[in-house]
Amino acid sequence: MGHGGEGMSLEFTPTWVVAGVCTVIVAISLAVERLLHYFGTVLKKKKQKPLYEALQKVKEELMLLGFISLLLTVFQGLISKFCVKENVLMHMLPCSLDSRREAGASEHKNVTAKEHFQTFLPIVGTTRRLLAEHAAVQVGYCSEKGKVPLLSLEALHHLHIFIFVLAISHVTFCVLTVIFGSTRIHQWKKWEDSIADEKFDPETALRKRRVTHVHNHAFIKEHFLGIGKDSVILGWTQSFLKQFYDSVTKSDYVTLRLGFIMTHCKGNPKLNFHKYMMRALEDDFKQVVGISWYLWIFVVIFLLLNVNGWHTYFWIAFIPFALLLAVGTKLEHVIAQLAHEVAEKHVAIEGDLVVKPSDEHFWFSKPQIVLYLIHFILFQNAFEIAFFFWIWVTYGFDSCIMGQVRYIVPRLVIGVFIQVLCSYSTLPLYAIVSQMGSSFKKAIFEENVQVGLVGWAQKVKQKRDLKAAASNGDEGSSQAGPGPDSGSGSAPAAGPGAGFAGIQLSRVTRNNAGDTNNEITPDHNN
């Protein structure tokens, strides 16, 4: 039991060791599962359905990780016995062959961050020794054929850990972004409350009936008058700079809120726009928290391009940085376009300034593209940070994969900058500007009203299909009647949602692409 004791099989391992380790693993797993279940119960009690669905998305990601882990464990023996010629593995290496020889010569005397972590986590060192023993077996298997293993057990083990670190980092960064962003958005609640108070102020009501010059309005002064009035380039420059300071002002909030209400629910001027905006953001959050298939494709491409001398880690850090600046600039420019439309059409107005929301202000007339970009930005930034810490813990700070210090520091600075800017500027901007499209989202209704509307729409669709089928039948057959509850095709009473009677609907669109299934198209002709 001396030197080879660490390689003993389960047959010669004490039962108390097996039972103890099994107990710890099962206890930790059950604790995490119960904790997630508790969070789900709390969200249900508070009627936070979007956040509950986001939690379910996290559970799906954990299940996917478990399945990936199972596949790697089951097939690691088969993968390690897949042998190839040595010259096949001499191309597209993350580190040069000289670096590998230098690392092998100095491995026994260099103290790295990896060894520091192994001091506190002895199981890591034990795992590496066990992997070394298995690696010797697999190398012997392939050497008999004059070949080398395609992927060593140790490399497979490190890849296994990286996938877990990446997924956990992405979920963590998304949650932190939404928490910090929601904190910023909650500061706007005082503006919503002040608007509600002004409705009962006689002086405010009298002032709204006055005729005012458009260029004297604070919203127009901020977005139309100034350096961007007569130049497109200067206008975009102003939008670019504004995302770094006062990205959303009170005049922005008041004007955009009024434009939304007058366009989509004119009959309900008392709509709590702030509460609706928060519900819509929670709906969007469940789209962002997961790792979509196209993000996994990005991971594979990045792992493929991680070639020595290309400095892929350094250049890839600029992708989310550039995208984040572009998204923030575009969102600010949408607000500027709304101001330009009003200022160019009117000289003076009676009452409040009203803007006209439209999909035409967004890229390809699709506001949901912005959400996809934010999703990619958060994932790529999480990928960058996760990869850094994974390399640091696994191979050490001086690893050739880590790169030189002059490439490491800018990456970390950019990563922190992206996280802060996205949390406190871009996400709040998206929360309000995304409402400036041609459609409003189903979050405008309370949950019980949403269920009633969806049920009503399904019944209308079923009756329409039955009528279409009957009209295509024999001419002599009797036509299907409309039925007692389908006379006018009007929506049923929504009970607590009767306050939304001012919202006129022509149809409820439920598409399969992206987050458009959250949108309801209003009828502007009524």
UniProtKB/Swiss-Prot annotation:
Compositional bias segments (type: Low complexity): 476-495
Membrane topology of this protein: Multi-pass membrane protein
Membrane-traversing stretches: 12-32, 62-82, 161-181, 288-308, 309-329, 373-393, 413-433
Alphabetical list of InterPro entries matching this protein: Mlo
Biological processes, Gene Ontology terms: defense response
Keyword Cell membrane: yes
This protein's UniProt keywords: Calmodulin-binding, Cell membrane, Membrane, Pathogenesis-related protein, Plant defense, Transmembrane, Transmembrane helix
GO cellular component: plasma membrane
Side of membrane Cytoplasmic, spans: 33-61, 182-287, 330-372, 434-526
Chief subcellular location: membrane
Protein family: Belongs to the MLO family.
Protein purpose: May be involved in modulation of pathogen defense and leaf cell death. Activity seems to be regulated by Ca(2+)-dependent calmodulin binding and seems not to require heterotrimeric G proteins.
Protein name: MLO-like protein 1
Source organism: Arabidopsis thaliana
Classification of source organism: Eukaryota, Viridiplantae, Streptophyta, Embryophyta, Tracheophyta
